[in-house]
Amino acid sequence: MSHLPILLLLLLVSPGLQAAPTQTTSLKATQVNCSNLREEIVTLLNQPPLPSSNFNNLNREDQRILMKPNLRRPNLEAFQKAVKSLQNATAIESSLKDLPLCLPMATNASMQHPIRIKDGDWNDFRMKLKFYLKTLEIKQPQ
């Protein structure tokens, strides 16, 4: 028997284990467990059919764009737009709608373009979204 459901339940009900709100996160973000949301999206991305999700296949320019703090929201908007062109992606689309609550408010508008995702290409979408989520995990305190 797996203890994962019990652990997840404890994380949801125990206030000491939840992240404290910071100045960079909205109050609504306290209602959304950002770490769990990222993990949920990654779990959905890992469902078959699985592409090779080797981040080394992601070119340096795409990595740079996905790592830029001032492009977090524009990149998320690009993923939200791209998910609409994918089949069987309703669950991911729903989770992406909650993700803006986990991002800091934009400080200044960027003149750079957000990430480009090939229309209808699951492999491209998965690889880039996984990398993007990983950068959020590293950059954002939880």
Swiss-Prot record:
Activated T-cells, mast cells, natural killer cells. One of its GO terms (biological process) is immune response. Its main location: secreted. InterPro entries: 4_helix_cytokine-like_core, IL-3. Transmembrane segments: none annotated. Pfam families: IL3. Monomer. Granulocyte/macrophage colony-stimulating factors are cytokines that act in hematopoiesis by controlling the production, differentiation, and function of 2 related white cell populations of the blood, the granulocytes and the monocytes-macrophages. This CSF induces granulocytes, macrophages, mast cells, stem cells, erythroid cells, eosinophils and megakaryocytes. This is Interleukin-3. It comes from Saguinus oedipus (Cotton-top tamarin).
